[in-house]
Amino acid sequence: GITPDCTFNEKDIELHVYSRDKRNGIILKKEILKNYDLFKES
């Protein structure tokens, strides 16, 4: 299990996920918009 001395905790995970989403946000939004346009055109 995780000990109190462990430096990797839930807050680190949240910050890592937030940072990753912020880096990939534009690409993800473009993909979503493209997929939506393809669905709307079909």
UniProtKB/Swiss-Prot annotation:
Q: Which reaction does it catalyse?
A: a 1,2-diacyl-sn-glycero-3-phosphocholine + H2O = a 2-acyl-sn-glycero-3-phosphocholine + a fatty acid + H(+)
In which tissues has expression of this protein been reported? Expressed by the venom gland.
Keyword field? Allergen, Cytolysis, Disulfide bond, Hemolysis, Hydrolase, Lipid degradation, Lipid metabolism, Secreted
GO cellular component annotations of the record: extracellular region
Q: Which domain of life is it from?
A: Eukaryota
PTM note says:
Contains six disulfide bonds.
- Determine if rRNA-binding is one of this entry's keywords: no
Q: Which family does it belong to?
A: Belongs to the AB hydrolase superfamily. Lipase family.
Q: What is this protein called?
A: Phospholipase A1
